[in-house]
Amino acid sequence: MATANSSVKIGNVTFSNSAPFALIAGPCQMETREHAFDMAGRLKEMTDKLGIDLVYKSSFDKANRTSLKAERGIGLEKAMEVFADLKKEFGFPVLTDIHTEEQCAAVAPVVDVLQIPAFLCRQTDLLIAAAKTGRVVNVKKGQFLAPWDMKNVLSKITESGNPNVLATERGVSFGYNTLVSDMRSLPIMAGLGSPVVFDATHSVQQPGGHGGSSGGQREFVETLARAAVAVGVAGLFIETHQDPDNAPSDGPNMVPVDKMPALLEKLMAFDRIAKGL
């Protein structure tokens, strides 16, 4: 059976369960070119000062919004142009999620990490298509999935010839409109061989909690992120925005960007202790 790489390198960014955590961060969706550059510049500046490896994330299409009327993003073609320019300007790798097999080939020339949404983590054809691009694949563990069941998910990618895969914990369904984070899932998934990422913002999401959109409890992002880092992870996934309360999607669980530096400093301290760095 093909195995995953325990250390995944993306440009100058390294994901390893025994190394300092890398950060995947950015707004939920790509709103405009100007907004993307503003957010990217802020994140690049703070992570450079703190010495944290950054992968910038944003979604060109939020295809699984609660309501048909909800905003979804600027679309694939425009987003690829922006991602290419962001990489030239700031030099970091970029990540976006894909929802169909056709999108894999379309984004791979520009995007460094293809992300499989949690709802789609068992879609075999999508996993194979993402794997065959040769890009790093980040798989969100489904809210309905046990951590040990990620073994089969990851093997669909590695057995398609791609050992560079990340496994991301983003909470598990706990009754209606609620998620809970079981920190046991982090070492369990690490035992499967891949670097493990903890999604601190979607883990506090309340799916469909606002009727026509999802709610969230951003006040618990730091609590869960500290717990995850204390257990030990290769990376943290944190969505952020300059004005979360007025963001077009996932505002209730995004971290205000001006609060990110203090949060990251605390998490770095926990990371050093947990890993003996």
Curated annotation (Swiss-Prot):
Cite a GO CC annotation: cytoplasm
Enzymatic reactions: D-arabinose 5-phosphate + phosphoenolpyruvate + H2O = 3-deoxy-alpha-D-manno-2-octulosonate-8-phosphate + phosphate
Whether Transferase counts among this entry's keywords is: yes
The record's subcellular location field reads: Cytoplasm
Task: Mention one GO molecular function.
Answer: 3-deoxy-8-phosphooctulonate synthase activity
- Sequence similarity: Belongs to the KdsA family.
PANTHER family found in the cross-reference section: PHOSPHO-2-DEHYDRO-3-DEOXYHEPTONATE ALDOLASE
NCBIfam families hit by this protein: KDO8P_synth, PRK05198.1
- In Swiss-Prot or TrEMBL terms, this protein is called 2-dehydro-3-deoxyphosphooctonate aldolase
